Amino acid sequence: FLVNIREPAGVAILEPKNMSQKAFLPISIVGPHGLDINDESGLAYVACDAGAVVVLDLSTGHEEAVVPIEGVPDVVWLNAKRHRLYCALGKPGIIEVIDTLKLVVDEKVNTEEGAHTFTFDRKRQRLYAFLPKSCRAAVYKET
C-alpha cells in the first residue's frame, strides 16, 4: 500500500500483511494529497498542495518529473490506456489533464468551484465529476 505523508513530504510504502512501513520515499514538493499508481511502469503520480504533480519511480524513489498545476489538488485518477492523469482542483473548479508521456498539462476541463470529487470508468472511458454547488454530476467522455 502507498500512503501520502504530509510532513515530511513523501510517500510511505506499507507492507499489506501487517501495515508496517517498508520504505519512505521523500518528495521535493510540499503537501502530497492525491495519489495514483501505474502498475505497469511502476510510477506514482502524487498531486501536491504546493501546485504540482510529482512523478515518482517506486522502484528507485527517484523523482522523474514535477508537473506544475494551477492550484491545490484533491483527487487524481490515472487513465493508463490513454496516458492521461486527471487532477481535480476545486478552486477554481477545473480538472487538469496531464499527458503522462509528455508530462505537461494538455487540457483543462471546466467543472465548477468546489468540484473536487470524481471517478473514472476505465471500461467506458468516462469521467464523472460531482458538482456540489449545482447538485449535479458532469460526465466527460474520452475520445
What is each residue range found by the language model?
Residues F1-T143:
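Predominantly soluble domains enriched in secretory-pathway, periplasmic, or organellar proteins
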